[in-house]
Amino acid sequence: MTEQQHIRNFSIIAHVDHGKSTLADQFIRLCGALTEREMSSQVLDTMDIERERGITIKAQSVRLQFRAADGQEYQFNLIDTPGHVDFSYEVSRSLAACEGALLVVDASQGVEAQSVANCYTALEHNLEILPVLNKIDLPAADPERVRREIEAIVGLPADDAVEASAKEGTGIREILERVVERIPPPQGDPEAALQALIIDSWFDNYLGTVVLVRVMNGSIRPGQRILTMVGQKPYVVEKVGVFTPKSLMVPALETGAVGFVIAGVRTIEGARVGDTLTEQDRPASAPLPGFREVQPQVFTGLYPVDSADYESFREALQKLRLNDAALQFEPETSQALGFGFRCGFLGLLHMEIVQERLEREYQLELISTAPTVIYEVLTTDGQVLKISNPAELPAAQKIADIREPVITANILVPETYLGPVIALCEERRGRQKNMQFTGGQVMLRYELPHNEVVLDFFDRLKSVSRGYASMDYEFARFESGPLVKMDILINGEKLDALSWIVHRDVSERRGRELVVRLRDLIPRQMFEVAIQAAIGARVIARESVKALRKNVLAKCYGGDISRKRKLLEKQKEGKKRMKQVGHVEIPQEAFLAVLKSDKR
């Protein structure tokens, strides 16, 4: 058993693609946790999607043994964290389980907005932060400039930051020696009542729900009767273990340790991330602080292409929910798409990943509607409704006010691209709050309506700044504005899945752009298809998809004009009847046309 003084719990904070997972691989290699044959790149990124996209989505942990220069053996618990803005809650949980963090910055690119946000989270948890300059082997690396950036933007002294290259394996031992020197050992009383923080939980087909915990006080061993403090659910511990990165069962998890607990938990609600485990017979006086319910920010309708898949779709969502506390869903029906679910996500990347996992891991074919945000609607009789689906908006005469969510965005951009980025924010109805120049980079603070950001703001930001700008945002408040609901009618029938809420000033332009896109996407039918955008009873834009028609005069060689007219009239009658009963097939791209409607 390792003494508490010789334990170090730390995580790695880095922006997407700054080399965090590669650095973790090097730590595992140096500590000899896996043989060379067992090493695969990005060991901690276990999901296929994580490796393909090169991003970390779920928090992972690994226990390593390291013999330091002072001759002592230390136990490291490395908790790998996601770097993308959508997963900031997973980051805050991982950081709450640590005493220190490595701030990994790409020595060629410099500090990015996401790292700044995560750094502030780490400082709120009173963590010791060690800056590391990675990718020092790149020709474009400029360590001095990046050191100045860290000091100016993050406010951390960086003169002694370790220079390393995770790819080449240089500077790795130096980083680990620095971890031993600078990061404090865990505080906590082995004799006190058990308090263990749930960092993550996931579903395993053989073991049921596996719960990843950090023991703050006391210890956990098999046979113990435990209780979740927020959920008040009792369990009996069956097994405890650690990842080295292979799973290894151990006799007990002592104070300061990070490991997993298997206790017959059947659902993720049974062990919610951020809850505290304690003993039934000797409970702790209070749960660990700082945890909140995760609130989804972005909503979309997901529908199976084949309605027979509805039940398997529900089961797949429930299984994903086991691993993903932030995913929320409830049944919903649409006239156009049948039965499906309204799903809530942390952001667009989270939405894409969930949809991709459903299609890949559960072999489902899904149609998704355009994402929306939550609006507050004040009705004329004084009720406040939270609406995430535009189709559920009450009739216009019953609405007193619609309030849209506003976010505060921090955007880091090189000075060269400042103009286009400001123009983009202004175009999206942003209000500038602050601008700060620091050594070639500018930190912009803007207030933006969330529905302007949720569609394609990130893509546009990357394209106007050649990929150099980065952004992090948080919800600020709800604000009332002149918002209207726009309906799309196909042959006079409302298509509920394409309704959306827009600002009155841009509604006509957006309506015109959307019907033009739909005209190009809806395939031609045997009858004419009218596409209209309407606000209330007023049609603001219209396009038509022309009918396909058979040449009914092909057999008439010369002959009487009245014969030809008769055939044409007969065809016209048939088309009219078809239009009354005909059903228009709407392709999946059409439902996402809303997303692209303002690409100019």
UniProtKB/Swiss-Prot annotation:
Residues 5-187 form the tr-type G domain. It is a peripheral membrane protein. One of its GO terms (cellular component) is plasma membrane. One of its GO terms (molecular function) is ribosome binding. GO terms for biological process: positive regulation of translation. It comes from Acidithiobacillus ferrooxidans (strain ATCC 23270 / DSM 14882 / CIP 104768 / NCIMB 8455) (Ferrobacillus ferrooxidans (strain ATCC 23270)). Its main location: membrane. The keyword DNA damage does not apply. Its EC number is 3.6.5.n1. It is an enzyme of class 3 (hydrolase). It catalyses: GTP + H2O = GDP + phosphate + H(+). GTP binds at residues 17-22, 134-137. NCBIfam families: lepA, small_GTP. CDD domains: EF4_II, EF4_III, LepA, lepA_C. This is Elongation factor 4. It is found in: Cell inner membrane. PANTHER family: TRANSLATION FACTOR GUF1 HOMOLOG, CHLOROPLASTIC, TRANSLATION FACTOR GUF1-RELATED. It comes from the Bacteria. Required for accurate and efficient protein synthesis under certain stress conditions. May act as a fidelity factor of the translation reaction, by catalyzing a one-codon backward translocation of tRNAs on improperly translocated ribosomes. Back-translocation proceeds from a post-translocation (POST) complex to a pre-translocation (PRE) complex, thus giving elongation factor G a second chance to translocate the tRNAs correctly. Binds to ribosomes in a GTP-dependent manner. Keywords: Cell inner membrane, Cell membrane, GTP-binding, Hydrolase, Membrane, Nucleotide-binding, Protein biosynthesis.
